[in-house]
Amino acid sequence: MLAQGMLARRGWLAVAGGLAAAILGFAGCVQQPTFRPGPADPDAASEFTQTPSGLRYRILRKGEGDPPKASDTVRVHYVGKLDDGSEFDSSYRTGKPAEFSLSGVVKGWTEGLQLVQPGGMIELQVPPELGYGRDGVPGAIPPGATLNFTVELIEIL
C-alpha cells in the first residue's frame, strides 16, 4: 500500500513538473514588449543640419522649456546604431530610461542634447571625432565609426 501511494505521488509530481515546464516554455515563446522611440512631429525636419564641429542633427519632436547645459544630468531614452543599421546600445531594450551627465558622454551627445528641449526627440549623426574616434570600442563599435542615435530627452535632472 505504501509503495502504491509513493508511486502515485511520484506520478503526480512528474505531471506537475511537466506542466510547469510547459508553462515556462510557453511563456518564453511569448514576445516581450518592445519599446521604441515615440512619434515624431508631422512637420519634423527631413534634412539634417550640420554644426561647425561636424555633428549632424535633426529635431524629430519639439519639446518645451530650456534645453540642458553641458554640465546637466539628463534622463533619456535612446537607441544607437552603426551605419549598417546594427544596434549597439538601447535603453528601449530594458524599457527603462537612462541617466547621463552630459559632461561624461561622447562629445557628440554633449553638443547634440543641448539642441533639444525636455519632451523633445533628436536624431544625431556623430562623426568619429565626436564619438569613439579611431579606436572605437572593442567588440561593440568599430574604429572610425559614425554613431547614429535617436534620443528622447525625458527630463533634465
Where are these regions (language model features)?
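Cross-family detector of peptidyl-prolyl cis-trans isomerase
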Residues: 2-157
